Amino acid sequence: MTEATTIPSVTLSNGVVMPAIGFGVFQIPDDAMDATVRHALAAGYRAFDTAPMYGNERSLGRPLTDSGVPRQELFVTTKVSNEDQGYQSTRDAVEKSVARLGLDYVDLCLIHWPAPARGTYLDTWRALEALHARGLGPAVGGSNFQPD
């Protein structure tokens, strides 16, 4: 095993501190997740990035909760898929993601793609703010937004 490395952190605009480098689990199959996460934790990773469309939230949550690393030392990000955008569907989708992960909350929940043609990303954002206020996510944001 590699000796764990201390990863620098960044402070978000709302004061939430997150590791500057995270471990993405896109395309990691369920049968490889336990060993992969164990090695990532041993190497010092504490931030993990997933999404419902990756199909592996449940298999990521298991090794994280079984790792013995205190929850407050982990930083878990998930995302809202395009088909889940809209106020109520976003709320439902995030609650399902948290349940699949086997956690009480996610540290960061992102709008995976803005999909402006759908006209729902503002309602999606409002839902993320409401979930944040309920404690299901200390931080919210967007990914893959374009400059225009």
Positions of predicted regions on the chain:
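N-terminal binding-site loop/beta-alpha segment at the start of enzyme catalytic domains
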Residues: 1-74, 127, 133
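Residue-level detector of alpha-helix boundaries and kinks
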Residues: 8, 45-46, 79-82, 113, ...
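Active-site mouth loops of central-metabolism enzymes
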Residues: 19-31, 78-88, 113-119
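Hydrophobic faces of well-ordered beta-strands that scaffold small-molecule active sites
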Residues: 19-24, 48, 74-78, 106-111, ...
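Charge-rich, low-complexity amphipathic helices
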Residues: 45, 62-63, 70, 82, ...
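Glycine/proline-rich, positively charged
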Residues: 85-148
